[in-house]
A protein has these predicted regions:
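Intrinsically disordered, acidic Ser/Thr/Pro-rich N-terminal transactivation domains
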Residues: 37, 41, 49-104
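Long acidic/polar interaction regions in large eukaryotic complex-forming proteins
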Residues: 80-170, 174, 178-183
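Post-HExxH zinc-binding segment in Zn-dependent metallohydrolases
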Residues: 172-174, 185-193, 200-227
Length: 267
């Protein structure tokens, strides 16, 4: 789950030579070039030959609606052995990715201030590139719309202590690590923003670093949840059509509900 870490950026547009698009409105920002080197090293060390992929500049809304429908239909299955295995693998692989980033000299710090730590994606990328630092929201402070239950903590390895600390010695859950590594690899490699197209890029980049079963859990936590938020039932009218900006019933990114939390595997 990355719900509290996502800063919604509205009206994503492509940067062109004719028009300088301000930070916060860009589809792609200036990336952190070292991110690609760290990602390639991680994959090479694990014989991961998944191709790099290409930047995504537009989103297929029909496909995103279908993904949202799949997420909506998923049954929360925390006791399913395959689901347990997938989430455990995802947690372990996320920890290994976190270690790779830390070994390269970067730091993560839990944000306890008011509002958002960054006004837009470029500010986050600049912090990573210039200061080797990233703020994240604590999972304990925000896990969807509700607090973590003890039952969820026992069932889901992502909600357990990872053994890592932030730069101030605060405990990091595996899901805290995921919020960090997902924004690090998913957003700073291509420089993509946080809107729907940016999140599709983040999933596309970062999912390639996981093994197949772990990737399915990771996809549930990213592409599945994001598609539900942006293209799910809350964004449709009585006819099932997507409500466009300016139409009655449209919800701005900050008004949208978080996706319901589920331990399940996207196809």
């Amino acid at each position: 789950d990355e719900s509290e870490q996502t800063v919604s950026e509205i009206d994503e547009v492509t940067v062109t030579e004719e028009k300088v698009v301000p930070a916060g409105k860009r589809l792609f920002n200036n990336p952190n070039t070292e991110t690609t080197e760290i990602s390639k090293k991680y994959k090479k060390d694990r014989n991961n030959e998944t191709p790099e992929g290409e930047p995504i500049t537009s989103i297929d809304t029909e496909n995103s609606r279908d993904i949202a429908d799949v997420y909506e239909s998923l049954e929360d299955s925390p006791n399913d052995p395959k689901v347990q295995e997938a989430y455990s693998l995802m947690a372990d692989e996320t920890a290994a990715q976190h270690q790779e980033i830390i070994d390269a000299g970067y730091e993560v710090e839990i944000w306890n201030g008011e509002g958002e730590p960054y006004a837009n994606a470029q500010e986050m990328i600049d912090d990573v590139r210039d200061n080797k630092h990233m703020w994240i929201y604590s999972t304990e402070a925000g896990f969807g719309d509700t607090a973590i239950t003890e039952e969820q903590r026992q069932q889901n390895k992502l909600l357990q202590d990872s053994g890592f600390k932030d730069k101030n010695g605060n405990t990091l859950l595996y899901n805290d690590l995921f919020r960090f590594v997902h924004d690090f690899f998913g957003h700073t490699e291509r420089g993509n923003g946080f809107g729907p197209v940016g999140e599709e890029n983040a999933w596309d980049v970062h999912s390639r670093m996981y093994t197949p079963l772990a990737r399915r859990a990771m996809t549930t936590e990213t592409r599945g949840q994001n598609s539900w938020v942006n293209f799910g039932p809350q964004m449709r009218n009585d006819k099932g059509e997507l409500i466009k900006k300016g139409e009655e019933g449209y919800l701005s990114p900050r008004e949208r509900a978080f996706a319901p939390q589920k331990m399940a595997l996207m196809p």
